[in-house]
């Protein structure tokens, strides 16, 4: 059966038009004009539903508000975009967006002490407790993206001129968080296998002590880096940090929400996760978890008093700027959470799917994987300079021929025009889709007469 994506969106939007009638009406019910509008819209909806059950082809949907394209890549395509794969909303999260899309929708029943993590209806307070338990830490807060978690910790721990140890694969937001606090990043080099080791971290710490005369203020390290998606020895690195009495921040932007993370077993003082990258949540969303030892500092409450009014806001947490996610982002994050918890237990299967695809890609002569292999993550960096890029050199569309071929097979998310080094993720795809994806790549290779190896 042909997909009826446009009709599904048309029906959803028509239901919203019907919903608007309810919003415009009095609490006592619909007046005569509203009843007529209801009947008219319902008739239009029934026509759309009939089209859903027919083979007829209808016109494409109009744009939202006249200018915004309908985003249907998750319905119509296999999306391998690395930063989108684990952020796809669950069904329950999409329902939450519908019900809680209005501005401060979390605040309907906010009561004293007037703080987000204390709200009981919806159960936001309980969610904060569950988040901390999820990563085996003592306390947690939701934040507008992992970057705000980095920022909160850096502003707490780093003074002007302090050094902060980071990976040479560190994300730019880690740099900015340190810079904003007045600190200076000091990068640990990767080894020949593109891995950050505990020994290299210890050497860097010693270098900093020798040069500055004092310990770094913080060690901030990615478990899985975003550049080549290798797994780094965060447990060993945390142990080294603590040997020097330096607090350790675990960057779980590519782990929290997709694979099991035990903050205390790792030795983390702070765990930062990304909701929109790895927890099936809308952007911006994320989490910061910490221990009871560090919570009084990073979650400190304001002590400031107004000089004229004597006002004070004692329950508001300074680094959080008070409340953080006050609407549908948070509720969708909460709605996805049961499924997110469950899917972390299937991580081994996700890794198997990643290796299935990479194994298929490597049968195409000249293709390489730049990430550690066998894969330990669903995100991979590959090099097709010796395969698909050879075709690009003589093709009239250059590297865009490859995007054309993938798109024709219903695959999107690769960096358009890239045929040399690029990244993709198989996370969240069913086995049926992973097999289809692997077959599509070998089909394209065969079409352009690129030699294939036999599978081992």
Curated annotation (Swiss-Prot):
**Which NCBIfam families does UniProt cross-reference here?**
PRK09331.1, SepCysS
| SUPFAM superfamilies to which the protein is assigned, alphabetical | PLP-dependent transferases
Q: What does this protein do?
A: Converts O-phospho-L-seryl-tRNA(Cys) (Sep-tRNA(Cys)) to L-cysteinyl-tRNA(Cys) (Cys-tRNA(Cys)).
N6-(pyridoxal phosphate)lysine occurs at 277
Catalytic activity annotated for this protein?
A: O-phospho-L-seryl-tRNA(Cys) + hydrogen sulfide + H(+) = L-cysteinyl-tRNA(Cys) + phosphate
Q: Which cofactor does it need?
A: pyridoxal 5'-phosphate
List positions binding pyridoxal 5'-phosphate. 146-147, 251, 274-276
Q: Which UniProt keywords are listed?
A: Protein biosynthesis, Pyridoxal phosphate, Transferase
| Source taxon at top rank | Archaea
Pfam families per the record? SepSecS (PF05889)
Task: Name the EC number(s).
Answer: 2.5.1.73
Which GO molecular-function terms appear in the entry?
Sep-tRNA:Cys-tRNA synthase activity
GO BP terms in the entry: translation
Report what the protein is called: O-phospho-L-seryl-tRNA:Cys-tRNA synthase 2
The Swiss-Prot or TrEMBL record describes its family as follows: Belongs to the SepCysS family.
How this chain assembles, per its entry, is: Homodimer. Interacts with SepRS.
